[in-house]
Every structure is written in C-alpha cells, then in structure tokens.
Amino acid sequence: TPVGAGDFSQYITPVLNSGADVLILNHYGKDMINSLSQAVQFGLRDKQVNGKNFEIVVPLFSRLMAQGAGDAIKGILGTTNWNWSLQDEGSKAFVQSFGAEYGAPPSMAAHTCYVQTLLYANACEMAGTFYPPEVIKQLEGFNFDGMGNGPTLYRAEDHQCFKDVLVVRGNDNPSSQFDLLKVVDVTPRAQVEYDWTIFGGELGPYEVKM
C-alpha cells in the first residue's frame, strides 16, 4: 500500500471474502493506526474463517502506535523490541530511573535510545577514539546482555541486531495508558536469525571521505 494512504478500505475489502484467516499489517506510525482501526471497523477482529478466529497481526508495535489506535488495539497480536514490564535487572533499573525522572514508564523508543547510547559510548571507549570506522569495528560481532531481551548480537556481516523477540497482544483491560500491550510469548533469537547473504549488498570500506 502507498505510504500515507489514509483510506485503506480498498485494500481491506478484498480480504473479507478471500478465505484468508490472517491479515498482516506491515505498516508503521500513522499508517498502522489507520489500517488497524479500519480493519477492526470492517469486522476482521471478530471474524471467523473455517471455524478459526481471524487474526490481525502487527509486525512491530510502538507505544505511540498502540495509543493512537485506541480500542482497536485490543486482542491484536504483534511483536515489540522491549516492554517496561520485563523483570530482568537491567530493565527494572531503567524503568525505576526513568520513572523517577519523568513520572511514567519508558516506551520502547526510549529504551532503544538508552541502549544505543550505552553501546556507542562503550564502543568509543573500547576503540579509544570517536573515529567512526574504529567505533564500527568494535560493534561488529559484539555480544552484550542485561538490556531486557537476553543475550544480543550485533552481527558483523550486515550490522543487524539479533535478540529474543517479544510477542505481545493488545490488552483487553489495560490499567493505564502505558499498559496497552501484554507480553504473551518470547520467540528465541535462534528462530529469527537468517543467512546474511540472502540479501546481498556491500557495507562499504572502513574509511571516512572528507
């Protein structure tokens, strides 16, 4: 679908009588809010196909998207990179310090910024310089833990970050505007890793062109 389509009815209508029992809304931001809200309005969340409940899936949730979709989020499956309800020591420490400063639990985006800042600072320290190519080399193949989703790898070959994936479902009875997504399962990292060569491409040389 075109980015910023707004009206997704022409794409949702054919799904109604297609025989499909899953709709994956591979959208982000306002497009996800609009497409999900409209899919629910069309009755897909309550639909049954061949005796099975129809499922709407959002591949990657954010708090702002969940809040923007309102009640349409209830019961909807998806994934997220982190959730403030995690009980590992790193997550609890971050939630406590963030809450003390801002009066609310951190979002997934806040967690990402926090983790990336720590990783960059650590890479600069290991490299002994801010020179980008040397910092990059420190991050390539770097393993770390303690940030919420278990052992994590920055793969050297394509710079992709791999960790356990949280499967979430929109909370039917949220206790607050921050309790919209409930973790229902965790997919192990090994199940989402893939062969880096399938997409081809080159990362480029370790040099900065002036």
What do the predicted segments below correspond to?
Residues 71-81:
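Rossmann-fold dehydrogenase core element
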